[in-house]
């Protein structure tokens, strides 16, 4: 959650990432530029429910599990910045797919500054998805060790039970809905289910 001051207003936003704060600032700027009224803006922003959007937070077996969408280089940079701000030990899972809705071309991965993950205090980095090996290769070029998996649910459950209790799951577009659903199931039943 982010708190910030904007044009004399103190806002306690429910935004979980800087990305959402940027959207808030853009909306405010647009209203101000158009000369539209913004009475109630603060209350609307503070009450806004981001729902199943670009990020969700779960608790699985006492572990904080954050799900984040990253579908292009700029979005991924934002997620890496978010991970770096969290100085606690963590586990990171990166799921990259290449379905039609994701786009078949994953060359954009080479435009992301993954080298910063070396400073993320990650105990484990695991790649998943149809392009898990490509993601692993991308990390290898940055001298970042990683594992790969075809069983995302088992790896999440293992990290939740036996890991740092601080897990980031970063997915591209096609992985968002299924992963969100899977994490919600694990949250209800625990990692043993």
Where are these regions (language model features)?
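A short, well-structured beta->alpha microelement
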Residues: 147-159
